[in-house]
Structure formats: C-alpha cells, structure tokens
C-alpha cells in the first residue's frame, strides 16, 4: 500500500545543507498499522510528510496504492491526496464551525450533495463516538474529543491510508489510550492502512503490527513488533523498549548503592533483560545451581508486544567473584542482557 524507495530529503539552509532523510526505504502492506519511532529531530515528521508530498523528497520515489506520487502533475496529486487522510499533534479545527461542520469541510470542498454529507458525517461521528457533540464548538471540547473530530474529518473522503503525526503526544495517558483504541478499531472495521510516527514505544507496543526505528535521518531497524521486541539489534531500539518499563530499586538499596565494591562482602545488583525465548527458560535458577550463586530478586516485570514476551529482573547476586563472572557470561551466552547497576555493602 505504501512504498518509500530510497527517500532522501535535503533542506537548503542559508549557510548549509541539512539532510533530514538519508536513503530511507519502507514498505507497508495494505491493512497494516506501522509505527515509525525516533527521538526528536530524527526525521520522523519529515518522513511522514513525504508520503503525501507535503514535503517533496529530494530524491527517491513515493508509491501509494500502486500510484507513484512523485510523478504526478499538481492536479493529479490533489486527487491522489484524497486517498490519504492525515491527523496531527495539534487538531487544527475551525473555531467558528461546529463539530459536524468541521468534519463536513472536506466533502463541502468536493461539492458533495447535502444529503450525502448528512449521511456520511452522521456515520463518522457515530464511529468516533461524538454523535452527541455534533452541534458543539471546539472551545467546548476536551483534547481527546478534538482529536476525534480531526480523525473523523480525515476519514471523510474515504481514504485508504491514514497518516498520524504524533497524534497522541499532546494528550494525557487515559485519553491517549482511548485514541489508540479508536485507531485500532478504525483499522479493523475499515481496513485502512495506518502509518503513525511517535517517540513513545508504548504507542507502538499497543497497536502496531510493524515498526521502523529512525535515527538522524536513517532507518536503522525495522520489522514486526514481535521481531523488534524479541531481538532488538540496535542500542536505540533497546532504549525504546526499556522505556516501556517502570521498575526501580527499593529505597533501602538505592541509598546504599555504590559504583564499585568497597569490600569483599559487597555484592553486585544486576539487571537482567529477557526477550523472546529467554523469558520462559529458567535461566536464573539454572545459573544459580550451575555456579553456586544465590540470587535474591528485588523486582521483576514481564510484558507482551506483538505476541512476544519480554521483561526485566533486578537481583542481588551473592557468591565469589569468579562464580558471579561465570554467571554473567552464561546468561549473556543465552541472549540475556546483563547490566551491573552497582554494589551493596
């Protein structure tokens, strides 16, 4: 449905050239939800704006539903864009128009009949859960309701693709959840292909089928959500996955934690990161028996994404230095990421 082939975008600044995208290729199948994740300034917004040519690539091709947009005339591009809806972080609603009138605007611009507009917009407001707000004005809506209006407006022309540019980043956590569930329902019921960009791995984990990681304008990793969570190949992907966990040491340990052991009875506090098959394997108990170390688990958390389990365990590891070293090596050989957080006396 969406094919980006070798997309490069260079901005000409007064004193230099800025490469926002560097030879990016991405393929999204029909009906998929794909998330592009990256830090601020990584090139995410530029990438998504290249899909409907709000930003024209310096080089490369953009193909949507079999049509190469980069080869269309201005008139042809206007028509092709009707198949591509888009929502933004900011809702861009017209304050002087009601909810119904805001959603109806694209159909009015296409000179649709009043009867068709009435039928279509009524159905869309029902879909996004705003039937009772049809005559309300944006000033009387919450942030989540405003985004629902924007989503309905983006769907008014029956697009095959929906682009979401940081659509939940201005919303509180509870509202974010409701918008993500709405997008997932729209994908399921309408079969619409969704490309969203975000800096939050939690968003990707909840609704995406596919994920691409972008860093400094380059696509550094991509695959299904399950593949990326089970076996992240880049440090950036690992950082994003870790950000979905909220685990910490008990205060008693934090107060006594040191970077280096102060004496022979100072034992390491180690964080073990499990993904894929290593989650279910009894590796910690095996290591304990094999090398004669004792592991006192301080905190642990397991989660799912894309049908794959992943998680962390933080433990105090007691034993002689050689045994602890062998334990760490053994676990790393079995695809467990090992990080010494410090030592307790």
UniProtKB/Swiss-Prot annotation:
Q: Lineage of the source organism?
A: Bacteria, Pseudomonadati, Pseudomonadota, Gammaproteobacteria, Pasteurellales
Q: What is its EC number?
A: 7.4.2.11
- Binding of ATP: at which residues? 38-45
The record describes the protein's role as: Part of the ABC transporter complex MetNIQ involved in methionine import. Responsible for energy coupling to the transport system.
Q: What is this protein called?
A: Methionine import ATP-binding protein MetN
**Pfam name, any one:** NIL
The UniProt entry, under PROSITE patterns, shows: ABC_TRANSPORTER_1, ABC_TRANSPORTER_2, METN
Organism this protein belongs to: Haemophilus influenzae (strain 86-028NP)
ABC transporter domain residues: 2-241
Q: Where in the cell is it found?
A: Cell inner membrane
Query: What stretch or stretches form a coiled coil here?
Result: none
* Subunit-level organization: The complex is composed of two ATP-binding proteins (MetN), two transmembrane proteins (MetI) and a solute-binding protein (MetQ).
| Keywords, sorted A to Z | Amino-acid transport, ATP-binding, Cell inner membrane, Cell membrane, Membrane, Nucleotide-binding, Translocase, Transport
Q: Into which EC class is this enzyme placed?
A: translocase
Q: Name one GO cellular component term.
A: Gram-negative-bacterium-type cell wall
Task: Kindly list the GO molecular function terms attached to this UniProt entry.
Answer: ABC-type D-methionine transporter activity; ATP binding; ATP hydrolysis activity
